[in-house]
């Protein structure tokens, strides 16, 4: 009788352990961009589980969240992973302030692309390219013209 009770307890323990779901931590990627003098962030996450939800500031999204970061905003975001009826929340901290500071500094430092005055920059580029092409064409034609004359004169001089 004692072995029968131990067997039932062991079977119950195995069954309860089989129901437990193991959650793998989602892989998240945070990118930054400077748009209209604001630092925008994009958080993308992938997982092997059925579904996930990302929460950052007041934004909620499935697999991705796009938000505008401003000084004073929180550095936290969380990802909730679902598997059947079970779920688990992973908490993350990210240095948004430092990354946005670098992103904004670099965008102000190097105003090379995209052009701010598109028409002027494009017109200048096209004019310069046309001038260089014309100069190269004139030089090539002059070289060919005088080279053929020299070779013709050299042929006449030969006995």
UniProtKB/Swiss-Prot annotation:
Regarding domains, what does the record say? The lumenal domain binds directly to the peptide-binding domain of class I molecules. The di-lysine motif confers endoplasmic reticulum localization for type I membrane proteins.
Per the record, ranges on the Cytoplasmic side are 145-159
The record's comment on protein family reads: Belongs to the adenoviridae E19 family.
Question: InterPro entries under this entry?
Answer: Adenovirus_Gp19K, Adenovirus_Gp19K_sf
Q: List the disulfide bonds.
A: 28-45, 39-100
Q: Which residues cross the membrane?
A: 124-144
- Maturation and modification: Both disulfide bonds are absolutely critical for the interaction with MHC antigens. N-glycosylated; high-mannose.
Gene Ontology CC terms, in alphabetical order: host cell endoplasmic reticulum membrane; membrane
Q: Name one GO biological process term.
A: symbiont-mediated suppression of host antigen processing and presentation of peptide antigen via MHC class I
What does this gene product do?
Answer: Binds and retains class I heavy chains in the endoplasmic reticulum during the early period of virus infection, thereby impairing their transport to the cell surface. Also delays the expression of class I alleles that it cannot affect by direct retention. Binds transporters associated with antigen processing (TAP) and acts as a tapasin inhibitor, preventing class I/TAP association. In consequence, infected cells are masked for immune recognition by cytotoxic T-lymphocytes.
Superkingdom of this protein's organism: Viruses
Q: Where in the cell is it found?
A: Host endoplasmic reticulum membrane
Enumerate the glycosylated residues. 29, 78
GO terms assigned for molecular function: D-mannose binding
Its signal peptide is 1-17
- From the Swiss-Prot or TrEMBL record, give the protein name: Early E3 18.5 kDa glycoprotein
Q: Where is this motif: Di-lysine motif?
A: 156-159
Keyword terms of this UniProt record: Disulfide bond, Early protein, Glycoprotein, Host endoplasmic reticulum, Host membrane, Host-virus interaction, Inhibition of host adaptive immune response by virus, Inhibition of host tapasin by virus, Lectin, Mannose-binding, Membrane, Signal, Transmembrane, Transmembrane helix, Viral immunoevasion
UniProt keyword Membrane, yes or no: yes
Q: What is its main location?
A: host cell
**Positions in the Lumenal compartment:** 18-123
Task: Give the membrane topology, semicolon-separated if more than one.
Answer: Single-pass type I membrane protein
